Swiss-Prot record:
<protein>
    <recommendedName>
        <fullName>Cupiennin-6c</fullName>
    </recommendedName>
</protein>
<keyword id="KW-0800">Toxin</keyword>
<dbReference type="GO" id="GO:0005576">
    <property type="term" value="C:extracellular region"/>
</dbReference>
<feature type="modified residue" description="Serine amide">
    <location>
        <position position="21"/>
    </location>
</feature>
<keyword id="KW-0027">Amidation</keyword>
<dbReference type="GO" id="GO:0090729">
    <property type="term" value="F:toxin activity"/>
</dbReference>
<comment type="similarity">
    <text>Belongs to the cationic peptide 04 (cupiennin) family. 09 subfamily.</text>
</comment>
<keyword id="KW-0964">Secreted</keyword>
Length: 21
């Protein structure tokens, strides 16, 4: 469960990075 949350946060950060760029 925690692993999934960490993965989601990682994807969210990547998506945010791409959006900011």
């Amino acid at each position: 469960f925690i692993n999934t949350i960490r993965l989601l946060i990682n994807k969210y950060r990547e998506w945010k990075n791409k959006k900011d760029s």
